[in-house]
């Protein structure tokens, strides 16, 4: 089952809010539902970024203690995984503060380790994990790859820059490649994080 989780960071493309997902507002992300008068299935947060007290557009509410050792997004993912969700789409979690962006990378890795998959969107890019093979058909544009493992073994075929070999965690080797025709990225060992232009 797929869940849409909406965080507080800025984005313009609200079309996702109208699609058939189980919709979760992550604290300040509730503004997007409230401002557009769209119902969400669940609100999760400690209300530290909301100046809206009216949570009437949320069918269910989980109010967290502000003195906690887990982020709203990690709490939500744990809750949803336990409810049987294994596919996650994130909006409003890939802009703004650098530490929150890094948190999203950690969350992407965590979801994978728990058997789920996720894609993070902003208006310009999407971020996702590759651990087997990712094929490209009609997509075009920039893509950057980084190893989430200490060292990954990869094959890049039919992108602007082809490559077969090792990619280490502290390498910029696969920064700013381009999808120019049908091709693929294959991970033989390790895990990659991809930032792909939308």
Set out the residue ranges of the language-model regions.
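Long, charged alpha-helical interface segments
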Residues: 130-198
């Amino acid at each position: 089952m797929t869940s849409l989780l909406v965080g507080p960071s800025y984005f313009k493309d609200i079309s996702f809010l109208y699609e058939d997902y189980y919709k979760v507002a992550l604290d300040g992300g509730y503004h997007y539902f409230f401002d557009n008068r769209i119902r969400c299935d669940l609100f999760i947060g400690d209300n530290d970024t909301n100046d809206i007290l009216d949570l009437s557009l949320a069918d269910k509410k989980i109010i967290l203690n502000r003195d906690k050792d887990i982020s709203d997004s990690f709490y939500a993912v744990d809750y949803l995984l336990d409810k049987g969700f294994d596919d996650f789409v994130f909006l409003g979690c890939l802009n703004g503060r650098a530490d929150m962006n890094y948190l999203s990378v950690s969350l992407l890795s965590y979801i994978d380790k728990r058997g789920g998959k996720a894609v993070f969107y902003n208006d310009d890019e999407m971020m996702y994990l590759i651990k087997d093979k990712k094929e490209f058909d009609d997509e075009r544009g920039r893509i950057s790859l980084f190893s989430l493992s200490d060292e990954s073994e990869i094959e890049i075929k039919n992108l602007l820059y082809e490559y077969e070999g090792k990619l280490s965690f502290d390498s910029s080797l696969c920064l700013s490649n381009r999808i120019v025709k049908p091709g693929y990225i294959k991970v033989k060992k390790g895990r990659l994080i991809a930032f792909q232009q939308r």
